Amino acid sequence: MGSVVPEAINKLSAVHDNLRSDNPEDWSNAVHSCRRILQDLADAIYPAREDKVIDAGGKPKTIKLGKDNYINRIVAFVEERSASERFSHIVGSHLGFLGDRLDSVFQAAQKGSHDVIVSQVEADRYVVYTYLTVGDVIGLL
């Protein structure tokens, strides 16, 4: 991971420290760091670019690939690099779930809801999902 996203190593260290805390605010910080790690990964492997249009069952579908569309960019990378359609589908599904949840946590925090992460176990779960997903993606390099 360090060779692809060097700054992720420091972020993962901070995530680990935050998860060891008894403070729910630290758990939220750990989850926010997961979002930033995925954003950094997207920037490293599939920088923002113009949207692309794909054929989705005979209908054109626009895939947004801008700066804020970090999950779409990682999914596009996986789809372009993976020889296995099933692998692409599984990783894409995990990324979709994880990205939606991390973005929801982030948006709630922006609105002042500080109790979004209610347990250390929940925070641990997002960190593990992030770590495994990043590993799957980096494995395609």
State each model region's role:
Residues 1-4:
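Long, contiguous internal "core" modules enriched in hydrophobic/ aromatic residues
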Residues 6-10, 18-141:
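Amphipathic, oligomerization/interface secondary-structure segments
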